[in-house]
Amino acid sequence: MSDPAQVLRDFAPTKEFFVGIDSDGCVFDSMEIKHQECFAPMFIKHYALQATSKYAREVWTFVNLYSKTRGCNRFHAVIHALDLLRTHKEVQARGVKVPSFPALLDWVERESKLGNATLDAEVASGNEALVP
């Protein structure tokens, strides 16, 4: 399988500057469909929010597409969405227990490079609270 990043590593500059455009959600209107059809359903499934799926989808979409937090790191988005969902009156009325993850919040607050590699390293270092 070819390495898609190899094109950039092999790139030979012909000018003293480079203009790059992140097309995901900027050039192409692809963010809504990704969040509504993929990320929101996985958020609901992963955190067992089926009993409140309508509101979980609403909150996820708001956090990631329509609020001041649009474009935030995915770990921040999960925390924001769960926190907001926990305060939603319809969710509270249904008695749905929305999970909280203090270990994730702690890690997000102290880690400067939020990504899968640093999360894996944190788990490997013994932070069992982050193990799914």
Residue ranges and their predicted role:
Residues 1-21:
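Non-catalytic pre-domain segments flanking phosphatase-related domains
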Residues 14, 26-132:
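Alpha-helical substrate-recognition element adjacent to the catalytic core
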